[in-house]
Every structure is written in structure tokens, then in C-alpha cells.
Amino acid sequence: MWGSQHRSFQVALWFLVLAVFLLVGFLHVDFRLLIPDKVQEPPVTNIMFLKTHKTASSTILNILYRFSESHNLSTALPEGSRVHLGYPWFFVTRYVEGLKQDAHLQHHFNIMCNHLRFNYPEVQKVMPRDTFYFSILRNPVFQLESSFIYYKDYAPAFQRAKSLDEFLADPWKYYNASVSLKNVYAKNNMWFDFGFDNNAPADMDYVRKRLAEVEQRFHLVLIADYFDESMVLLRRRLRWQLDDVVSFKLNVRSQSTVSHLTPESQERVQHWCALDWQLYQHFNRTFWTQLHAELSPRQLTEEVEQLRERQRELMALCLQDPEPKNLTHIDDQNLRPYQGGKANILGYNLRHGLDTTTLHICQRMAMPELQHMAHMYSLQFPDKTPKDIPFLKK
């Protein structure tokens, strides 16, 4: 009798220990890892991307063009010989090819992603009501440094300054707000792209209202300084497949043209581009808040590595060398990028002997922005005169 009770006690004790063990494990489970991706839901196909300047936005444009072509979607492309949607003027519908000019007509496209100065009422005439709006920002220190090199010969504010350090030491010596349409690249350029006054005082009440406006109209603002993390979040929001957001870096400069600003100059950028700085600071915070709400740290690490691994696989499949090349070392002129200002923009060489399907994929991943835009234009408007890319004829 006593032996039977003893055995029953041992069994009960064993089950109690097991229950405690399972409970501890249960409490430490990250349930977000157990929730599968919503791959069964249809992908988002109505998308407006505000393409800001010098923010890795050319790479995102490539991603959107590829998705548009592979899913047979319509894209709001620049009209006629234009390469932008009216920039730096405010966007209006007449800048879009194939859009009949009728005050009462709304012609909806699936994707809009070329450079424009944001004008929400006009964009609404082009895009469907359920459009997903997103954009991307970059640390203004690095954004302005890139702009200085790229627009050195175009922006009057940059032309006489020997370096960005020299410009920032006394910017009003070089900057004239009255020629703002050419000088937008020299002061609060991202703020300007969102449709705001880049010369406005950085008054807190004004800034707060404009930030609230951006939050109201845009579902997501990405951060170029964390590009891979941005692609992970974008993929989840759009419910796309991994390959849809894998990319090769486009419109990148050689390191020899990158300036390293002094600490004093970096601090001066925060004051000179105060509107851009507050825009960036605000949406850098919201980006990480959204990212951490969506993924656990472990899940984020895994998905970023998954993205990078797939990029390495495609680079090995497509490219002769994963390192981008100078213009003179790019064999195919259709893969030679436009050269802006003092920047040395790099591109890629594809492997020889690729089969037709692989070549199709690789060409589009490596295709520079202007050539890709011309390609999309020919696909969508085969009866119209093809886009002219003058620098390819040199």
C-alpha cells in the first residue's frame, strides 16, 4: 500500500516538474516567430514612392520597375522626352505620359516612383484610393555630402566652393534663395521633395505641422542608412516575396569621390539643413518603432541575413564581379550609368553565357535608372517614340 502511494507521489512529482519546465519554456517563447509571413495574402500592387534625392532611391526605383514589369502593372512614367515628373516644379498630372487631360477624368496607374515634388491633390488624380504611400530619408550629413559632389556643376551655391567644408563654413556666401529651383540641392533638399519650403525657418510649430502632414499621407518612411532593415519592413508591408526586394546597389559612387567631413562641418549641416535634420530625426524614430513592433530582434536579424544571402547568390549568378566598376570598365553601354557632376558613378558587368531567363533577371537588376525608365516606357507605350538617352550616343 505504502509502495503504491510512493509511486503515485513520484509520478505526480515528475509531472509537476515537467509542467514547470514546459511553463518556463512557454513563457520564453517569442510568439512573433511562430506567426508565419502573410504570403498567402495578395501582394500590394498600388504604390506611390516619393523618390527623394541622394537617398538610395534609385535602387528602390529599380525594385519597383522590376515588380511592375514582372506583374504586368502600369507605371506613371514621365511624359515625352522628360526623365522626371516635372521636378523641381510641383507635380501636376500633365507630366504623366498617357494621361488624358480632363479636369473630371481620373486615370489610375498601379505604380508611381519617378522623381517629383510631392503635390498630394494632383498625385491623388493619378493613383487609386487604396495606394500605399512610402518614401525614404537619409542622414542629412551624408545626403548633403552626396549632393555637393553630384550637383557641383549644376547648383549655383556649390559651384564656387572648393569643398563642402568650405561651403558650410559660410554657406550664405554661396547660397542665394532667389535661385531656389537650382539651389534646392544645397539646402533642405528632402524637405523640398516632400513639397515644403526648403527656405522656411525651422520654427517648431511649423515643423510639427508638416511632420504630422507627412505622417498622415505616408504609410511608411524608410531610412537609407539602414537599407537592408528597410527592405525587410517594406517587404512585410507590401506582402511581397523575398526576390522582389533583393537588389544590387545602383547609382553609387566610387569611394575616391566621397568626402569625409570634419566634426565641425557635420554639426553645421544639422543647423544649415535644420528642416531636413528634424525630418530625418523624427522618421528615424518612427521607423525603428514600427520595425520593433513588427519583428523581434531575433527575427529581424534572421530576415536581414536572409535578404543579404539571397543578394550574394544573385550577385554570384549574374555578375562577373560583385564589386561595381568604373564607367570605362563596363562592357555593355546599356549598363553604363549617367555621370553626374564630380561623382564617379559605378555600374556592373554581367556574366557571359547566361540563359535567356537568367539574363532577363540579371539585366533588370543591373540596369541604370535612365535606361530602365526608357525600357519601361517602350514596354508601356510601344507606339510612341522611344525615350532618348543622349549620353549613350557619346
Curated annotation (Swiss-Prot):
UniProt topology in membrane: Single-pass type II membrane protein
Cellular localisation: Golgi apparatus, Golgi stack membrane
InterPro entries xrefs: Gal-3-0_sulfotransfrase, P-loop_NTPase
Pfam families assigned to the protein according to its UniProt record, in alphabetical order: Gal-3-0_sulfotr
Residues carrying covalently attached carbohydrate according to the record: 72, 176, 284, 326
One GO cellular component term: Golgi cisterna membrane
UniProt key word Membrane: yes
Transmembrane portions of the chain: 9-29
Primary localisation category: Golgi
Chain ranges on the Lumenal side, renumbered to this chain: 30-394
Enzyme class (EC, first level): transferase
Regulation: Strongly inhibited by Cu(2+) and Zn(2+).
Keyword set includes DNA repair: no
Pathway linked to the protein: Protein modification; carbohydrate sulfation
GO molecular function: galactose 3-O-sulfotransferase activity; galactosylceramide sulfotransferase activity
Any single biological process term in GO: glycolipid biosynthetic process
Function: Transfers a sulfate group to the hydroxyl group at C3 of non-reducing beta-galactosyl residues. Acts both on type 1 (Gal-beta-1,3-GlcNAc) and type 2 (Gal-beta-1,4-GlcNAc) chains with similar efficiency.
Entry's family note: Belongs to the galactose-3-O-sulfotransferase family.
Protein name per Swiss-Prot or TrEMBL: Galactose-3-O-sulfotransferase 2
Organism: Mus musculus
